[in-house]
Curated annotation (Swiss-Prot):
It is found in: Cytoplasm. Keywords: Calcium, Cytoplasm. One of its GO terms (cellular component) is cytoplasm. This is Translationally-controlled tumor protein homolog.
Amino acid sequence: MKVYKDLYSNDEVCSDAYDHHDPFDNADLSSVAFEVKTSKVPKGEEDYGIGYNDEEGADQMNVDPNVEMVVDVVDKFGLQSLSLTKKDYSSYIRKYIQRLVATLQEKNPERVEPFKTTVSDFVKHVLANFEDFEFYVGESLDYEAGLVYAYYKGEEVSPRLVFLKDGLVEERY
C-alpha cells in the first residue's frame, strides 16, 4: 500500500486505497495533480463498505440520525479545514509554488518547466471557481505545507479531493 505524505509537513494525507482520477475531469492537469472520490461514512462505525452492499445501494444505508457523518479521507487522515479568502489563497499559492519550484530545481530540475506551465492552469481553474472550493491541511496544521482542495462534482453528496503531486512524497507500507 502507498501512503502519500505532504513533502514539507510529513503529514499523511491520502493513500492508494482511493482510486486516482484526472483533476476536474481535465487530463491536461493530471501531470501535476490527482483527484480522489470520497464517501460520507458514520464516524466511529467502520463496516468496511458492508453496509453499501444492499440492493438499494449506499443511499439507502440505515444510519442512526444521531451519528455524525464524516468524509472518509478527511477523517482517516485527520485533515483540518482551513478557511481562505481568494486574496489569502492567491498569496499562499504564489509562495507555495515558489517553494515547490525551488525543491524541484534541487531534486528534479527537468521537472521544473513542465510543472510551472501546468500548475498555472491548475491555479487559474481554482481561482475561476474559487467559491466552489473548500480547503484542508494536514493534521499538523502547517499552513506553509500543501493544501488539499475539496469540491463537489455534480450532484455528489461527498466532495472530491484534489492533491498536487509534486507536493507529496510516496511511502510504501
